[in-house]
Design a protein with these regions (language model features):
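Conserved P-loop NTPase motor module
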Residues: 1, 96-142
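Conserved P-loop NTPase motor cores
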Residues: 1-95, 121
């Protein structure tokens, strides 16, 4: 049985270099324990804030050693960080910048795929983040 550990907003823990070291070590060794560590954040930039840190204390290690990434919409200001990912080309980066709600670039060790997630109307009740779509849905329900 495999254990998956998902951490959201993990970058808030990166302030302390000792905590960074523990987190990075956990990500590096999880596979040996039949576990998988996942992290979620709003911007890839969060992992590049400590570029001068040693490898064992540098959060970018989590990204560069990941076997898979789901890259959803990023801001134009994040391009410089996306360009530092070896497995992305300019077309991939432009797709990520232009991605609409539910679109992402899936990158793993075997390749890349552009993914569009289409939510059912019932799923939109708890997963929608598009304010305009929510207004339209409310008008239709009324």
């Amino acid at each position: 049985q495999k254990l998956v550990y998902l951490s959201d907003e993990l970058h808030k823990s990166f302030v302390n270099k000792y905590v960074r070291k523990i987190i990075i070590n956990a990500y590096r060794t999880a596979g040996k324990a039949n576990a998988s560590c996942w992290t979620a954040t709003q911007s890839i930039k969060d992992y590049f804030l400590y570029k001068d840190a040693k490898a064992e204390e540098n959060p970018v290690t989590i990204v560069t050693q990941s076997t898979a990434m789901f890259l959803f919409n990023h801001k134009q200001a994040d391009v410089e960080y996306l360009q530092q990912l070896d497995n992305l080309n300019e077309n991939d980066i432009q797709f990520i910048i232009d991605a609409a709600q539910g679109e992402c670039l899936l990158v793993d060790t075997t390749g890349k795929a552009r993914v569009r997630i289409i939510l059912l109307d019932s799923e939109l009740d708890f997963a929608n983040t598009n304010v305009e779509l929510e207004k339209e849905r409310s008008r239709r329900k009324a």
